[in-house]
Amino acid sequence: MITSSDVSTIRAQVRSWRSQGESVAFVPTMGNLHQGHITLVKEAKLRAKHVVVSIFVNPMQFGQHEDLDAYPRTLAADSQALIDAGAALLFTPTAQTIYPKGLQQQTFVEVPEIGDVFCGASRPGHFRGVATIVCKLFNIVQPDIALFGRKDFQQLLVIKHMVNDLSLGIDIIGIDTIREASGLAMSSRNGYLTPEQKHTAATIKRALDLIANAVRQGEAIDKATAEGEAMIVQAGFKLDYLSVCNADNLHPAQADDKQLVILVAAYLGTTRLIDNLCFSR
């Protein structure tokens, strides 16, 4: 695996592959890799000749009081995991490389409406940061396909909308959430949880299953959502949001919507966890 923090090196390597007619997949990450990330890389290997991975803790997507400085940096372990998973190229830019003029003078990308609700409302500017860095990385790497986990469902939709709106010509592929045996969605932020909190955190998935099963059986969405909310709050969470939505546009679910997604964000102690569950009725 080649590792570089230099944009021109990354571009030259991708051009070399393309000159030989070889396909390129891309998996952008913030590092501190877990099995969910490794699954993305392995899935990418099934779909393209070469896999490029980026590791960049993006300051633009962190709010003023969020955990940018505390976010774990584990480059040595991440590099070995990516070698084992079959990645061909690792891009590790610095903030100076990505934002040479600083965040305030940086051109940005903003995806309206779908980026303004849920996590977009709770974390103002977050999806501007996500869309901007992903767009910039896409322009550097210029992959055929890019893979993202469905755990960050709203993020996945934001990126799909951006790619479509800006005619970037990249196929965006969502990969199912990887979960621990308890049902807890794998996340880098799980590392902030105590063992007891990790046990409690599995309640989120149970609440999502409860809501989905109730709605499938004909229960009113408001009633099912209230039951799920009670389960989450009683377990000790501070709920940010819990909503059943149209899976295509994140509008509140209507009676004739068939493809639905339940979105949830909640705090356990100081750790904010998100999850979702897609289902049809």
From Swiss-Prot:
Gene Ontology molecular function: ATP binding; pantoate-beta-alanine ligase activity
Keyword Cytoplasm attributed:
yes
Q: Where does it localize?
A: Cytoplasm
EC?
6.3.2.1
GO aspect biological process, one term: pantothenate biosynthetic process
Per UniProt, (R)-pantoate binds at: Q61, Q155
| Catalytic reaction annotation | (R)-pantoate + beta-alanine + ATP = (R)-pantothenate + AMP + diphosphate + H(+)
Report quaternary structure and partners: Homodimer.
The protein's name is Pantothenate synthetase
State the organism of origin: Shewanella denitrificans (strain OS217 / ATCC BAA-1090 / DSM 15013)
Q: What is the lineage of its organism?
A: Bacteria, Pseudomonadati, Pseudomonadota, Gammaproteobacteria, Alteromonadales
